[in-house]
């Protein structure tokens, strides 16, 4: 609508892996295709959306090159599941994360990596957030985990307008696509802007808060539901929407708001050696005057449990560790 061309590719992106997009409609009698999003305004940019071949390495490499040559376009690659991007790790290491530092070559490529610990097993749960955060330095790219539709929208809109161009890694939702609690009003889209940190949404009284839980992504909604179930009015839950560049001022502002709190928590679904914590332990802890405890799954060689029963037990243990210490 604002004149930015959008090019999107990936495996099953026209429909969406989770049957959530339906960006291209197919006539099964004539084989004609029609995309409603191409007909919103007479002055809109062009939308090109392609179902790509099953080669992450080849496709991300091509889209990276396209984004370099067309930096004014929003060039997006979406994984079916976030961990499928590991097939293109060479491109991510050699080009996406480091080309500006090595050669002064800038890219505006967007990677959408569906992520979420929802009981789907080791190969469909983790986008390997820790790997992207390990590559972050010198303001080389943005890594974000939007937790609401409006946050997702404002993140992409900001990226389209941002100069100089930088890659954007979005740890995108799965379960949240259909979770009623993860919704936004029309006003949330038409007003405001992307917020790197979203403060507590429950209306807790800051002076009465004894525990502040920082979280990023899907786990926020589990924590919110558990807090309501317990009738807890002394815990504030803060959503960190942008992981890099680390929003230091916004995090400190939340800590200052709850100055009476004595229990500061970083909560994550991922094992202790994965997810956001290794990055936060290195970059966040040294700049805050608080002791922060980690609540996570135990360190693991595998990203996630292989059985639904074990997954459920781990999720229950996380809630107890957060609210009972």
Predicted segments, located by residue:
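Fold-independent oxyanion-binding glycine-rich loops
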Residues: 11-13, 52, 79-80, 113-116, ...
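Non-catalytic terminal/interface segments that mediate subunit docking, oligomerization
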Residues: 1-72, 77-100, 186-238
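Phosphate/diphosphate-binding loops
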Residues: 64, 74, 79-199, 273-283, ...
């Amino acid at each position: 609508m604002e004149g930015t061309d959008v090019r999107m590719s990936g495996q099953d992106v026209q429909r969406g892996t989770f049957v959530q997009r339906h960006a291209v409609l197919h006539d099964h009698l004539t084989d004609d295709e029609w995309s409603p999003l191409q007909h919103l305004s007479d002055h809109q940019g062009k939308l090109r959306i392609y179902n790509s071949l099953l080669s992450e390495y080849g496709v991300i490499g091509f889209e990276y090159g396209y984004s370099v040559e067309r930096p004014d376009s929003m060039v997006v690659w979406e994984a079916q599941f976030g961990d499928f991007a590991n097939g293109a790790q060479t491109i991510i290491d050699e080009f996406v994360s480091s080309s500006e530092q090595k050669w002064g070559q800038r890219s505006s490529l967007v990677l959408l990596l569906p992520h979420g610990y929802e009981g789907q097993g080791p190969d469909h749960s983790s986008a390997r957030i820790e790997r992207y955060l390990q590559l972050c330095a010198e303001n080389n790219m943005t890594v974000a985990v939007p937790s609401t539709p409006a946050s997702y929208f404002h993140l992409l809109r900001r990226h389209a307008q941002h100069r100089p161009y930088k890659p954007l890694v979005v740890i995108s939702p799965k379960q949240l696509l259909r979770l009623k609690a993860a919704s936004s009003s029309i006003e949330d889209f038409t007003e405001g802007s992307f917020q790197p940190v979203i403060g507590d949404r429950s209306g807790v009284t800051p002076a009465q808060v004894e525990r502040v839980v920082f979280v990023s992504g899907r786990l926020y909604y589990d924590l919110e539901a558990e807090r309501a179930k317990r009738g807890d009015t002394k815990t504030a839950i803060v959503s960190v929407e942008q992981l890099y560049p680390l929003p230091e001022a916004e995090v400190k502002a939340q800590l200052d708001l709850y100055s009476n709190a004595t229990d500061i928590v970083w909560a994550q679904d991922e094992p202790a050696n994965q997810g956001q914590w290794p990055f936060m332990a290195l970059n966040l802890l040294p700049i805050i005057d608080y002791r922060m405890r980690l609540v996570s799954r135990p360190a693991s060689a595998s990203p996630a449990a292989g059985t639904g029963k074990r997954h459920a037990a781990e999720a229950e243990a996380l809630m107890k560790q957060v609210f009972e210490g």
